[in-house]
């Protein structure tokens, strides 16, 4: 992020309302993140986050069906997970609602865990590692960044995912260090 020097700050303070409006509109049209920030914080405070959530969810659905490079199905899924997390990070920068972020992550995690458990534990450990990263992020969100009442909503699925990862990918140190379950 660029640091704004004092000279620019002084010039902005001297701009009239019309010039400020032009500047805001130009910035919002050039930068999607700034547009979304304006939407959530100023234009539609009540439904802005939900609208961004629905847009992010539909973007994720498009990413699920896109074809990715990779020698095996596991590597293609690992690339898909990277693309999905990139989209979730864009959402999380603008929307500070951790519950919606957790819902998006759970939506992404349903894809690799909908396959057979034979997909895990192969020589293509990039897939196992990327799935493990997503599960770890979900655990961190639920246990540290959200209110503890939300743990009830996600606990069952997270524990199921942890069980599968420990059974199939326990040979990876990163996954071996995960808790057996969360309470």
Task: Describe the function of each predicted region.
Residues 15, 30, 66, 91-94, ...:
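Surface-exposed polar/charged interaction patches
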Residues 2-69:
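N-terminal interaction modules that seed assembly of large macromolecular complexes
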Residues 60-144:
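Charged linear interaction tracts used for macromolecular binding and regulation
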Residues 34-37, 42, 65-68, 115, ...:
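Sequence-level detector for tyrosine residue identity
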Residues 127-183:
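Eukaryote-biased recognition of C-terminal alpha-helical segments
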Residues 16-19, 120, 146, 150:
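Short coil/turn residues that cap or connect secondary-structure elements
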């Amino acid at each position: 992020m660029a640091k704004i020097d004092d000279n620019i700050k002084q010039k902005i303070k001297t701009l009239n309302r019309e010039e400020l409006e032009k500047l805001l509109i130009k910035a919002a049209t050039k930068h999607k993140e700034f547009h979304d920030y304006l939407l959530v914080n100023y234009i539609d405070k009540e439904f802005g986050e939900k609208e961004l959530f629905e847009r992010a969810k539909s973007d994720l659905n498009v990413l699920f069906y896109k074809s990715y490079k990779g020698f095996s199905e596991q590597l293609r899924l690992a690339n898909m997970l990277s693309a999905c997390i990139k989209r979730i990070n864009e959402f999380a920068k603008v929307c500070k609602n951790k519950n919606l972020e957790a819902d998006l992550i759970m939506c992404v995690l349903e894809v690799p865990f909908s396959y057979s458990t034979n997909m895990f534990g192969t020589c293509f450990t990039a897939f196992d590692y990327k799935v493990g990263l997503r599960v770890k992020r979900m655990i961190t969100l639920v246990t540290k960044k959200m209110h503890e009442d939300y743990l009830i909503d996600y606990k069952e699925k997270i524990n199921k995912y942890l069980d599968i990862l420990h059974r199939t990918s326990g040979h990876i140190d990163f996954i071996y260090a995960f808790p057996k379950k969360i309470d």
